Regions:
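Conserved, structured core segments of small domains
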Residues: 1-122
Length: 122
């Protein structure tokens, strides 16, 4: 059996694409008062809720116990990378200098990960 034969059984024939946006706290994050940070957090979460309601943001949330403490959260979009980056750059926390973003396309074997639409129940 050749390596090609072995790979044929290990590599999926089809992939699902997920666009992941990583939120990082920049080393030189703009300082704000606690009151201003609370307001920005409300604006940030409201913005993300709107993207979910539009059906372009699949899932999002903060990170915990990460290897790089600058990593603050991730968002998974139902969009191509360039479109997701454009929306992520419009996040009020990005505009305020509290987050910077990085993105990637994540390929998973077709059907192995399922995200419910808002309002769906498992």
């Amino acid at each position: 059996m050749t390596d090609t034969d072995l790979l044929a059984g290990l590599v999926p024939e089809r992939f699902d694409r997920h666009t992941i946006i990583f939120l990082f706290r920049p080393a030189d994050a703009t300082p704000y008062s606690d009151e201003e940070l609370d307001r920005l957090q409300v604006e940030h979460l409201t913005y993300l809720r709107g993207l979910k309601d539009e059906g372009v943001l699949i899932a999002n949330g903060p990170l915990d116990d990460q290897t790089d403490i600058r990593m603050r959260g991730i968002s998974i979009y139902a969009l191509p990378l360039t479109d997701a980056l454009e929306l992520a750059n419009d996040d009020p926390m990005v505009h305020a200098g509290r987050f910077e973003i990085r993105g990637a396309q994540w390929l998973t074997a077709e059907g192995t990960i399922r995200f419910d639409a808002p309002g769906d129940s498992a």
